Amino acid sequence: MTGREFEQYMCKLFDKNGFWALNIPRNESGAQPFDIVAIRGDEVYTIDCKVCSGAARFPLSRVEDNQLLAFEKVFWRTNAKIGFMVYWSGEIYFLRRADIVKAIENKQASIKLTYNDLFCTVVNEVF
C-alpha cells in the first residue's frame, strides 16, 4: 500500500465509522503537518499517515519539525487525538503524540509497534 492509498483508506475507514474525515491536500512544498482530520461529535483525530516496512518499528527520523510544532499547538488548544497512523504488515497502529515526544526527548531512534498501539487490522471491504 502506498502512502496516498493509506491516507485514502483511513479516510474511508473513519467515514464508515461515522466520522467526517478530510484528507488535507498537499501544498506546493508538501509540508502540511497532518494528512487527515476526522471528527465525530466531540471526538477529533489529527493524524499523519505513514507506511512502514521491515522491522515492526517506526523510525523517528520520519517525524518532521513542523509536525512536532503542530502537535503541540493542537494539543494545547483542543482535546484531539494527535499522532501517526502507521501501516505495517496489514495492520494499523496509532502512535500518540505523547509517546512520540517522549521517545524523541529520550533520543530514541525508533518506536516499536506493539499490540498496545494496534488501531485495527486492514479490512479490504473498506474499499
Language-model regions, residue ranges each:
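Nucleic-acid nuclease catalytic cores
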Residues: 72-100
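Conserved catalytic cores of phosphodiester-cleaving nucleases, focusing on short active-site segments
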Residues: 36-38, 42-55
